[in-house]
From Swiss-Prot:
Disulphide bonds in the chain: none
Protein name: Iron-sulfur cluster assembly protein CyaY
Biological role stated in the UniProt entry: Involved in iron-sulfur (Fe-S) cluster assembly. May act as a regulator of Fe-S biogenesis.
NCBIfam families: FeS_CyaY (TIGR03421)
Organism from which the protein derives: Pseudomonas paraeruginosa (strain DSM 24068 / PA7) (Pseudomonas aeruginosa (strain PA7))
Amino acid sequence: MNEVRFHDLVDAVQQQVEDAFDDSGLDLDLENAGGVLTVRFENGSQLILSRQAPLYQLWVAAKSGGFHFDYDETSGLWRHDASREPLGALLNRATLEQGGEDVEFPGL
């Protein structure tokens, strides 16, 4: 992977995450600045997706902890670097925990 491809992949996944939240009907605020997507839930908790270009990783900070994701070229998914869990599953779980709603993240 090169840096251009990495940034394109992260831009695309952040847009997919924004779209899923927009479609969810949850009362939240989304801010995407400097390559960092911040989701602020009504209760004040946050979910943060940030890019780590030197490592070609996507990092997620949630109430339950910090998670590092690598892009899997074979499946076309971002997967947790230790458990191999897809990004969408972690986002679903974190959103349920922090926002109280079951939001699907198709294709993630």
